[in-house]
Amino acid sequence: MQKDRAAYDEMYELIRPVVKAKTVLELATGTGLIAKHIVNAAAHIEATDASAEMIAEAKRDNRSAKLHFSVQDMFCLPYADKSFDVVIVSNALHIVPQPEKALAEIHRVLKDEGALIAPTFTHAGNSFFGKAKAFFMKLAGFPLHSRWTGEE
C-alpha cells in the first residue's frame, strides 16, 4: 500500500504544474482523490463519475469552492466544445468498452492547446505478474480492451 501511495503522491506532484490556474475536467473521478489533491493548483475542477454512489462519497469531505462533483456519462458530456484546458482520466480508459468513443468526447471538450492526462496503473505488459493481474482483472469483469503506445 505504501508503494501505491508513493506512486499517487508522485502523480499529484506531476499533475499540479500542468493544471496550474487552468480549468480541469476529471472523468471517472471515483471518490475524488486526484481532484482533491490538485484543486489548490487549478482555477476550477469539474470532477465526474458515472456512479452516483462514488460522487456522493466524493462530495462528503469537499471543502473547496473550486471543485464541483457531478454524475456524468463520459460518452455524452454536457459541456460545450473546447471548454477545458486539461482533461484527466485516470485508471479508466483501459476498462471502458469503447475507449475511442470516450477519447472523441474528450477531444470535443478539450481546448485546442489543451492537455489530456491519462495515467493508468495496470500491469507490466508481458511479465508473469502482469499477465496474472490482467487475467484476474478479466475474471472480475474488467478486461483490458486496448493498449496504446507512444506513437499512437
Give a label for each model feature.
Residues K3-K22:
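Conserved alpha-helix/loop element of class I SAM-dependent methyltransferases that forms part
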Residues I88:
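A conserved beta-strand element that flanks and buttresses the S-adenosyl-L-methionine
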Residues N91-A92:
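Short catalytic micro-motifs in class I SAM-dependent methyltransferases
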Residues E100-D112:
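A short glycine-rich, Lys/Arg-flanked "PGG" loop and its adjoining helix->strand segment in the class I
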Residues A115-L144:
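Conserved class I S-adenosyl-L-methionine
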Residues H145-E152:
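Short alpha-helix
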